[in-house]
């Protein structure tokens, strides 16, 4: 399983995950990335989302219709910047991931997990076994 010490984070990774920051839209690694695989928490390495639930939302950040395992996600009320939103954090590392909104695809449950690329790491399907995520291969065989 991939893990990263907080001291190894880049400036933007630290600002996003530890200071509840947000990276710029359309200028981040995964906003337009649709390869087959799994997205894991940048710090703990815990699997959070798969490419099967990723969709193009035109918001400029990676968007997913659901989490791989709801137990790996914490949702908190966020009243920052004069808005009322639902913050999404990683359960294992308590890192800020992004926000969840109720404007996602209706046929997939209506949610849009809007996630910062700086908070996640993509594991290609072909490398799942090699990197310790082999148990997730069956998720793609449905």
Curated annotation (Swiss-Prot):
Catalysed reaction, written as an equation: L-methionyl-[protein] + [thioredoxin]-disulfide + H2O = L-methionyl-(R)-S-oxide-[protein] + [thioredoxin]-dithiol
Species: Staphylococcus aureus (strain bovine RF122 / ET3-1)
A GO molecular-function annotation: peptide-methionine (R)-S-oxide reductase activity
EC top class named in words: oxidoreductase
HAMAP family: MsrB
SUPFAM superfamilies registered for this protein in UniProt: Mss4-like
Domain MsrB: start-end pairs: 2-125
One of the protein's GO biological processes: protein repair
Entry protein name: Peptide methionine sulfoxide reductase MsrB
Active site per the UniProt annotation: 114
Keyword flag tRNA processing: no
Family under the similarity heading: Belongs to the MsrB Met sulfoxide reductase family.
Gene3D superfamilies registered for this protein in UniProt: Peptide methionine sulfoxide reductase
Cellular component aspect of the GO annotation: cytoplasm
EC annotation from Swiss-Prot or TrEMBL: 1.8.4.12
Keywords of this entry: Oxidoreductase
């Amino acid at each position: 399983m991939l893990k990263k010490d907080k001291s190894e984070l880049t400036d933007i990774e630290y600002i996003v995950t530890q200071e509840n920051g947000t990276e710029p839209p359309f200028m981040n690694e995964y906003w337009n990335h649709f390869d087959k695989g799994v997205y894991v928490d940048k710090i703990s390495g815990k699997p959070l989302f798969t490419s099967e639930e990723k969709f193009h939302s035109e918001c400029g950040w990676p968007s997913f219709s659901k989490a791989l395992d709801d137990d790996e996600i914490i949702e908190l009320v966020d009243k920052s910047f004069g808005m009322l939103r639902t913050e999404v954090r990683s359960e294992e590392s308590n890192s800020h991931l992004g926000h969840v909104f109720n404007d996602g695809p209706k046929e997939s449950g209506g949610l849009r997990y809007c996630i910062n690329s700086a908070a996640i790491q993509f594991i290609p399907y072909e490398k799942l076994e090699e990197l310790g995520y082999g148990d997730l291969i069956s998720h793609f065989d449905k």
